[in-house]
Amino acid sequence: MTDNSKIRVVVGMSGGVDSSVTALLLKEQGYDVIGVFMKNWDDTDEFGVCTATEDYKDVAAVADQIGIPYYSVNFEKEYWDRVFEYFLAEYRAGRTPNPDVMCNKEIKFKAFLGYAMTLGADYVATGHYAQVKRDENGTVHMLRGADNGKDQTYFLSQLSQEQLQKTLFPLGHLQKSEVREIAERAGLATAKKKDSTGICFIGEKNFKQFLSQYLPAQKGRMMTIDGRDMGEHAGLMYYTIGQRGGLGIGGQHGGDNQPWFVVGKDLSQNILYVGQGFYHEALMSNSLDASVIHFTREMPEEFTFECTAKFRYRQPDSQVTVHVRGDKAEVVFAEPQRAITPGQAVVFYDGKECLGGGMIDMAYKNGQPCQYI
């Protein structure tokens, strides 16, 4: 039996059930485990309760239960500078960012990893649903989590080989239901705590209200592609490509009863374009350009390959051909895709392996840019 007692693993503990079970499993496997709670946002809910304080209490309770030391570290400045400023800049540019991808890259697996090293860590571990597998050459491959509905490799797609070399994902081979069962069997304080949703580290806020605190909204016209005025929009930043709800136009306009969707944005004229039908022609594209292209293991500077890709979380994979040129790529779809959204991540897969990805800049239909920014 392997003796893990001399291997120190620092676990990022959020106060949720996933990271609690992560720490428990590592402790049971004999590792030298330390729990660390990251405070990344100065957060008070509508009742005046600082949710981070409540979460830290849960971390402390679980750490005491399983018998590990625990600490709290403050990354509010790093989060603001590296994630939140990016988040706001993307919205200013009319895009729809994915802060969770950047949060993993810059906070959980950079700032936190650096802090863990000061504690003498050999590895860090988190409660993400993903797997790491080392090949005979020592290269680490990141694989999808066994629970297809919970797989989080999409959000981990910007991690480097160096980061993956130092990372463990103890939940990767488990189903979410099994994780809950483990927590309940062990009587963990977080066993019945509901999963958090919402923006990475910001939680379940009213998004429109939250965003308006930082970016002034500029109302403008809502138009169809052929120029019909459909009323007023509340501010381009509040809408994303393919969005159905919140338009306030129902079925009263147009000759049929199909629902209305956001099909494009014109940032320079502050126009929101809408159209009827889930598969409205303006929503369909057959290629995209992406930047910040990054692979989880070493790849050539310029090459072309076929793989599958996701353009948003929880969507089925689509077959694509990727033409890589440095940190940029053209991604050509085997079948037309709906609502490709600038600012979101495109993530590449080879079977179970997540190869990496990039950020979507523009979608194209037959070589012509879609009216998305």
UniProtKB/Swiss-Prot annotation:
Gene: mnmA
Stretches the record annotates as Interaction with target base in tRNA: 98-100
GO molecular function: ATP binding; tRNA binding; tRNA-uridine 2-sulfurtransferase activity
Protein name according to UniProt: tRNA-specific 2-thiouridylase MnmA
Residues at which ATP binds: 12-19, 38, 127
Residue pairs linked by disulfide bridges in the UniProt entry: 103-200
Subcellular location: Cytoplasm
Gene Ontology, cellular component aspect: cytoplasm
Chief subcellular location: cytoplasm
EC number, as in UniProt: 2.8.1.13
InterPro entries per record: MnmA-like, MnmA-like_C, MnmA-like_central, MnmA-like_central_sf, Rossmann-like_a/b/a_fold
Residue span of region Interaction with tRNA: 150-152, 312-313
NCBIfam families noted in UniProt: PRK00143.1, trmU
Similarity-based family: Belongs to the MnmA/TRMU family.
Pfam families: tRNA_Me_trans, tRNA_Me_trans_C, tRNA_Me_trans_M
Organism: Streptococcus pyogenes serotype M18 (strain MGAS8232)
Alphabetized UniProt keyword annotations: ATP-binding, Cytoplasm, Disulfide bond, Nucleotide-binding, RNA-binding, Transferase, tRNA processing, tRNA-binding
Role: Catalyzes the 2-thiolation of uridine at the wobble position (U34) of tRNA, leading to the formation of s(2)U34.
